[in-house]
From Swiss-Prot:
This is UBX domain-containing protein 4. It comes from Homo sapiens (Human). One of its GO terms (biological process) is response to unfolded protein. Expressed in many tissues, including heart, brain, placenta, lung, liver, skeletal muscle, kidney and pancreas. Accumulates in Alzheimer disease-afflicted brains (at protein level). It holds the Pfam family UBX7_N. The lineage of its organism: Eukaryota, Metazoa, Chordata, Craniata, Vertebrata.
Amino acid sequence: MLWFQGAIPAAIATAKRSGAVFVVFVAGDDEQSTQMAASWEDDKVTEASSNSFVAIKIDTKSEACLQFSQIYPVVCVPSSFFIGDSGIPLEVIAGSVSADELVTRIHKVRQMHLLKSETSVANGSQSESSVSTPSASFEPNNTCENSQSRNAELCEIPPTSDTKSDTATGGESAGHATSSQEPSGCSDQRPAEDLNIRVERLTKKLEERREEKRKEEEQREIKKEIERRKTGKEMLDYKRKQEEELTKRMLEERNREKAEDRAARERIKQQIALDRAERAARFAKTKEEVEAAKAAALLAKQAEMEVKRESYARERSTVARIQFRLPDGSSFTNQFPSDAPLEEARQFAAQTVGNTYGNFSLATMFPRREFTKEDYKKKLLDLELAPSASVVLLPAGRPTASIVHSSSGDIWTLLGTVLYPFLAIWRLISNFLFSNPPPTQTSVRVTSSEPPNPASSSKSEKREPVRKRVLEKRGDDFKKEGKIYRLRTQDDGEDENNTWNGNSTQQM
């Protein structure tokens, strides 16, 4: 269908100028509108409405549809209005119809339009005859004046048959007929009028031909666009079908490969089951022998492991590594046979420390246990001191027989014992008040854990030199670290060089 591309007023003017039927197709977005549009685009409908019809297509949501509905109410969508020259609808198609039905309606509308046009022409001719007859009857005697007035009218008004004729021959014959009836007074004006009429006729014909060519060109463009869209749609359908076929083939190939893999796995499983059955049948007779051999090998392996475990435990239990921790914080280590009595370890400790702590006893801290005289006769292995253990030396009071009385020694010892705390406090206060620079560290060990016992150190020749050095270097009892003073110990010099574990214990 060749739709008019302009606005509604332009389409109405074109229809009136060509004497055609004005067709308005109101379409929407529903399925019926799509079907009706397809019926309008049918070749039969296009051929039937090619002449005497000016069609325009408007959308229900457009402004043109709103203006059109104010004059012609749009009851339903889609709707097709066939409007004649007088503006009265000749036919209204509500809803969607088939292409054949639409062609029938178009023929019917064309017949109605032709009938109305013929009726209007007949009515116009009758009115003209009725007007001319009274004018002739009113003046029967003045024939000359009537003829002159008629000739003047013919000279002033060009014949209507010339302007409405479609062919040049018909116009020329009508012109010759009228010119033969003209009087001699109009003979000089007629050639100029005939030339103007011919120019107008030729101009109209050229315009009609241009319009026809333009319409033909538009129709060809529309057909080309339709063909292009049809070809594009066919290409898309072809590509879609090819993709679907390719996908289908790939899916079938994949399913076939899966089926083959599944069958191959089943065959392998069956073969494995057959092999297992054959092996079971082959080794059924020797199964008990194999199990007995395995049991014997397992027992031998367990016995070997037990022997290795015992030998390892025996090797570990043959040596006992004992760490002796002294009251001043120092320690020393020695190894003993695991079957040696605890008395041997005590004698080694006594030889090492000498008579520094007098009579002492041994004890363990974890678990806390102090060994008695009966324990000294037991083996280190029985006391759970093998393969390694840490033993603490606990000083005790010396026996009375080992004390040698000396009058001068006892007095000075008693005075030193009584005055020692006061001297220590006085030195601490003086150090704080006068803030003397700290002396250099010495490697001499000073026992600060317990005050000297006068009963145990009065006649000890080994401890007298130590006591004298302690009294001479009493100013070294305090160690300054920034603004903090602390008492010195005998291990201050060694603590910085010792190696400590992560749990604040010294490595052995």
